[in-house]
């Protein structure tokens, strides 16, 4: 186990492309840290620099307090688990797990003991004499993890290890990986493009885009207090709703009404450089069917009428999709997010509310919705910064 520190780390290529820019990150001993972002954001490059598979252009990487920039991968005492299982097809499960210990010329009795202990942890004991071709996808991934665990390294590096599994198996393996990491207490860096994996697995999450760490925090911090429009739109499913707005002396003007902001929120916004244009973000679960809220909730809610275009029932909840006549919001960060997620401009003015299953709203119906004005976020449309979290000079 070890602390991993990336101190002003940069990665540039001869063609001038910069994959990672000035990354400052301390991964605590025993922490489960997730690197998440769209393709090409720099997350795998970061993992490869920690592993020693990519050279660091500038900055310093320290593992357990020791500078390792110049150390070969084999000398860093870390273990990697890849998207592809990378198992030897001619070897049994036992031989695959034992392989790194065999390379290290460990005594056969010690190898047998460590393989047995690892197989027990991963529930592979009954499969030790099978070949990879006789295993399911989930079992193969557990064998790949076993090969990493058996070495007792300082850290695990995992590069999208669940991508090849079907949806049901991914959920199962997510839980198994989380429990295993807590049990072993080994520092783990995990790369994924799947925000659900990021939010459910990590102690902390690093959202990356354009080679830059957009925000580093707990899953709750990223969801409740996104640093900017990119993080707000990337984290959460369905995504946060964004409405055009204008700041007033006491609050905001939205396409469907006026919002008075609490004095403390006004104070936080005032501490930021004054924006020319603002965008208001509201999570789908904070927009409710007004027929289902009580009198107290109505006091601080803004209500508005919309026509529902689509209703999706998910059992415990329903998603109500609607449009407004207001102009669509535009910002550099939201346009970039739409591009990386392949969203069409046809849906740029579509919004979604998450309501309880007892809502009687039907497709094509006009309905009164309400959102809690205390649960909105205000963003600078130009810089993308969240104006409702304290400004850092």
Swiss-Prot record:
One of its GO terms (molecular function) is identical protein binding. Its EC number is 7.5.2.-. Part of the ABC transporter complex LpqY-SugA-SugB-SugC, which is highly specific for uptake of trehalose. Involved in the recycling of extracellular trehalose released from trehalose-containing molecules synthesized by M.tuberculosis. Trehalose uptake is essential for virulence. Responsible for energy coupling to the transport system. It is a peripheral membrane protein. It catalyses: alpha,alpha-trehalose(out) + ATP + H2O = alpha,alpha-trehalose(in) + ADP + phosphate + H(+). This is Trehalose import ATP-binding protein SugC. Disruption phenotype: Mutants show no growth on trehalose as the sole carbon and energy source, but grow normally on glucose. They secrete substantial amounts of trehalose during growth on glycerol. NCBIfam families: PRK11650.1 (NF008653). Optimum pH is 7.5. Active between pH 6.5-8.5. Unfolds at pH 5.5. ATP binds at residues 37-44. One of its GO terms (cellular component) is plasma membrane. Disulfide bonds: none annotated. It comes from the Bacteria. It comes from Mycobacterium tuberculosis (strain ATCC 25618 / H37Rv). A motif (Helical C-loop) lies at residues 135-139. It is found in: Cell inner membrane. SUPFAM superfamilies: MOP-like, P-loop containing nucleoside triphosphate hydrolases. GO terms for biological process: biological process involved in interaction with host; trehalose transport. Keywords: ATP-binding, Cell inner membrane, Cell membrane, Membrane, Nucleotide-binding, Sugar transport, Translocase, Transport. InterPro entries: AAA+_ATPase (IPR003593), ABC_transporter-like_ATP-bd (IPR003439), ABC_transporter-like_CS (IPR017871), ABC_transpr_MalK-like (IPR015855), ABC_transpr_MalK/UgpC-like (IPR047641), Mo/tungstate-bd_C_term_dom (IPR008995), NA-bd_OB-fold (IPR012340), OB_MalK-like (IPR040582). Contains an N-terminal nucleotide-binding domain (NBD) and a C-terminal regulatory domain (RD). Belongs to the ABC transporter superfamily. Monomer. Homodimerizes in the presence of ATP. The complex is composed of two ATP-binding proteins (SugC), two transmembrane proteins (SugA and SugB) and a solute-binding protein (LpqY). The keyword Iron-sulfur does not apply.
